[in-house]
Amino acid sequence: MRREHARAILFPLVRLPWLLIVLALIAYGAVLAGGIVPALTGAAVSGIAMFTLGAALAIYTGMRVGAAPVRLGGRAASARRAYLTLAFAATGVLYLAVIFGAINTSAGTLWTCQTWPGCAMTGDSAWLALAHRGLAGGATLLIAALAVQTWRIRHERSLRIAVAWALGLMLIQNLVGLAQVLLAQGGESQPVAVARLMHLGLSATAWGALVVLTTLALRRPFPAVALLRPAHVARPGMTDTVLLEGKPSLLKDYISLTKPGVISLLILTTITSMYITPAGIPELSLVLWTTLGGWLMASGSHSINCYLDKDIDVNMGRTGRRPIPSGRIPAWHALALGIALGVVAFVILALFVNLLAAILALAGFLYYVFIYTIWLKRTSKHNIVIGGGAGAFPPLVGWAAVTGSLAPEALLLWLIVFFWTPPHFWALALIRQKDYARAGVPMLPVVEGDQETRRQIVIYTLSMLALTALPPVLGMLGWAYLMSAAVSGGLFLHYALKLRRDGTTTTAWALYKYSLLYLAILFVAMAVDRVVFA
């Protein structure tokens, strides 16, 4: 009887926060539509709606998370006050940014302030727009500082997830806000309306994540000795509770998930491809945006690769020291990082380069993740041959970024990288053959043996060299490139034939290392020939 009575009381209370959330979102949506309500009324409605949303989220979070007070010493108590002050400051500043955003939407300042970050116009409209942008920038900095503090001294997974969502949403909404200003220069359109709704909607969602974070920080026990004890030494099997606490090399570990050393060569092929198109020398801003978008897209695919290959990496000496198999970073962090980087990269390329470049970069991302990592790498001895197509997308992205289209010349660049990949990677596979066998990865040396692998390296090397001779024949490049390609290609063939003959680890290492230099020399020679000697 008591249980039924308690249920009768608590059930409506559990439903109440969700009812408040729905009502708040409906009210806020009316303001986002823009022009439906006057500016001051819009500010009042949005303010009440956001306050109601925050209160409902705080109530719901508090009901789900029981309070666990802890008596703290002076140092820990001071750290807790500082952390909560930062959390409340970030929440408050973002609340004001959301309100000013709603006021700007109702007042239509988007059409009077179409420059960024400042305003060419003066008056009340400019003041409103600048106030909103200043508050949004301040909120972003506060959330970033809060994220650093959360990862440094708070080990609870729920807090880290909440602050990651808040920071990620805030960064994305900033990009959408910039895109909104650029799109508005072309007048009212459906993309502008969509961007406006996304911009304010994302900021409101980020504010909700901050409210949840602050509520959790108030209810959860603060680590009494988090600032005093030394960092934990990571071990395989460590739980999220102790993982990453005070780890000084955390940033380095996250960067390593993206494999920056590999990306640098990919980006080089992207940049040089931009300089050999018929369109001539591209603008520096276009090169920079393409480089940033391409780098982030490749970083995202590599991060997801680390997540998917965690069971393989732990069995290999070369990869066993990576952050995930060594236990320094939870695997799901790599997945979340990869998805976030891919989304941001696509937005950057689509907005500041062109849609074709964004689609091609995304195609390379999906090719690498699904066709190579998930499917071929684990099932076929041809994994490197077919999967190597993923690494050949960067030249296509660079070409499309400048021309807005693809041409046979761009596909030739794709083929050159495609045929370069097997000799390059099989040389490493010969060296790491035992590791791949232990991990159950059917690389060609594991399945067919050393002799067949060395023979295939020579075959693909000859095919690659034949392709590199085509640009001058097709009138795409001239004699300067041809001389560089002949000399560097001859040295590549020398290493491949030497490996075919003696099959030593030393020769395999020599071919592997030179193949990296060779691709860089080849594409730089293309750009130099086009820019200097054309």
From Swiss-Prot:
Pfam families reported in the protein's UniProt record: UbiA (PF01040)
Main subcellular localisation: membrane
Enzyme category, top tier: transferase
Topology of the protein relative to the lipid bilayer: Multi-pass membrane protein
Record-linked InterPro entries: Protohaem_IX_farnesylTrfase, UbiA_prenyltransferase, UbiA_prenylTrfase_CS, UbiA_sf
UniProt-annotated stretches for the region Protoheme IX prenyltransferase: 252-530
One biological process term in Gene Ontology: heme O biosynthetic process
Region (Unknown): 1-251
GO molecular function: protoheme IX farnesyltransferase activity
Alphabetized UniProt keyword annotations: Cell membrane, Heme biosynthesis, Membrane, Transferase, Transmembrane, Transmembrane helix
Enzymatic reactions: heme b + (2E,6E)-farnesyl diphosphate + H2O = Fe(II)-heme o + diphosphate
Annotated pathway: Porphyrin-containing compound metabolism; heme O biosynthesis; heme O from protoheme: step 1/1
E.C. number: 2.5.1.141
Gene Ontology terms: cellular component: plasma membrane
Transmembrane segments: 17-37, 39-59, 83-103, 128-148, 163-183, 197-217, 261-281, 284-304, 339-359, 360-380, 384-404, 411-431, 457-477, 479-499, 508-528
Localization annotation: Cell membrane
Similarity remark: In the C-terminal section; belongs to the UbiA prenyltransferase family. Protoheme IX farnesyltransferase subfamily.
Function: Converts heme B (protoheme IX) to heme O by substitution of the vinyl group on carbon 2 of heme B porphyrin ring with a hydroxyethyl farnesyl side group.
Further facts: Carbon 2 of the heme B porphyrin ring is defined according to the Fischer nomenclature.
Protein name (record): Protoheme IX farnesyltransferase
Gene behind this protein: ctaB
